[in-house]
């Protein structure tokens, strides 16, 4: 059973700052962002990892093993404040070992003559844009373990390409969308973890690696809180260098505007006579403190 502690503020402990690659500083300095927190998890014991390997007949990759020896799972969240309402937005999750379970036939399909996951297998690679890569299989040809359920938007999976017994060097990270199509993400777990952090856990960010991309609503959040993709060096720089296409300071600006009195124009003469337009003020003559020309 995984042991956890109450959520902590992201910058409250140095090792948590190291675990998040410093991205918490960027989030905390972004306009409108609030409640950046991490659920701290204790490291997994070695015998727990060995037990998982024996149970699943798979050797855990070295980078995955090192991750669990540092923290038994990862859960970081952040919210935004809009019109006094706090909206949960970012979510970064890596399942703990107890939830690193194999993706198998759902009980929904347990009825007689019901379709199975194996029925989705075909030889056409339809829906998979990575034609040069062999996609995972739902049958015994692959062993698939769930790393993140993506809040119901799909599943990020650790895939043993050649089934069981699973070898550490035969693993890849794939994304299974809601239509049950596979999309390749990274060769290694540590590379996926960097993607997770640099995309700030924005909703549906995994769909950026599909042929159809993210939804229009997710694009709005992406434009406001631009992911730090493909340039992890920005994570260690000052937050002043982090810029967005939109200016969030204007989006979250207070509605209480300061009224600025308008300057009054020249007062027309009391008489009703029409005369030529007002003459421009002389430039060479001295003026008083009130700005009116001095007559001689």
From Swiss-Prot:
Biased composition (Low complexity): 285-296
Disordered as annotated region, ranges: 254-296
GO CC annotation, single: cytosol
UniProt biased composition (Basic residues): 254-265
InterPro entries given in the database record: Knr4/Smi1-like_dom (IPR018958), Knr4/Smi1-like_sf (IPR037883), TPGS2 (IPR039231)
SUPFAM superfamilies: SMI1/KNR4-like
Protein localization: Cytoplasm, Cytoskeleton; Cytoplasm, Cytoskeleton, Microtubule organizing center, Centrosome, Centriolar satellite
Main location per the UniProt record: cytoplasm
Record-annotated disulphide pairs: none
Keywords, comma-separated and alphabetical: Cytoplasm, Cytoskeleton, Microtubule
Transmembrane segments: none
Subunit structure: Part of the neuronal tubulin polyglutamylase complex which contains TPGS1, TPGS2, TTLL1, LRRC49 and NICN1. Interacts with CSTPP1 and LRRC49.
Role, per record: Subunit of the tubulin polyglutamylase complex (TPGC). The complex mediates cilia and flagella polyglutamylation which is essential for their biogenesis and motility.
Protein name per Swiss-Prot or TrEMBL: Tubulin polyglutamylase complex subunit 2
Origin species: Mus musculus (Mouse)
Source taxonomy: Eukaryota, Metazoa, Chordata, Craniata, Vertebrata
Gene name as annotated: Tpgs2
């Amino acid at each position: 059973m995984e042991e956890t502690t109450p959520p902590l503020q992201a910058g409250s402990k140095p090792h948590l700052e190291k675990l998040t690659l410093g991205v918490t500083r960027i989030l905390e300095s972004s306009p409108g962002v609030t409640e950046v927190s991490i659920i701290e998890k204790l490291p997994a014991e070695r015998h727990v990892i060995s037990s998982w390997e024996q149970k699943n007949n798979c050797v855990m990759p070295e980078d995955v093993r090192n991750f669990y020896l540092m923290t038994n799972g990862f859960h970081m969240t952040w919210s935004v404040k809009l019109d006094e309402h706090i909206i949960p937005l970012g979510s970064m999750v890596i399942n703990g070992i107890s939830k690193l379970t194999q993706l198998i036939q759902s009980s929904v399909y347990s009825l007689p003559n019901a379709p199975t996951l194996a029925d989705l297998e075909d030889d056409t690679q339809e829906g998979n844009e990575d034609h040069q890569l062999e996609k995972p299989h739902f049958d015994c040809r692959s062993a698939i373990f769930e790393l993140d359920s993506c809040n119901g938007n799909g599943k990020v999976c650790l895939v043993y390409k050649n089934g069981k017994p699973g070898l550490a060097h035969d693993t890849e990270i794939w994304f299974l969308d809601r239509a049950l199509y596979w999309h390749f993400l990274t060769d290694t777990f540590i590379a996926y973890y960097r993607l997770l952090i640099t995309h700030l856990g924005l909703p549906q960010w995994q769909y950026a690696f599909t042929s159809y991309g993210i939804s229009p609503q997710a694009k709005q959040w992406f434009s406001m809180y631009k992911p730090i993709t493909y340039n992890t060096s920005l994570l260690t720089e000052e937050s002043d260098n982090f810029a967005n296409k939109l200016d969030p300071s204007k989006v979250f600006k207070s509605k209480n505007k300061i009224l600025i009195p308008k300057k009054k124009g020249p007062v027309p003469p009391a008489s009703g006579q029409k005369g030529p337009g007002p003459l421009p003020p002389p430039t060479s003559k001295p003026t008083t403190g009130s700005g009116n020309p001095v007559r001689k």
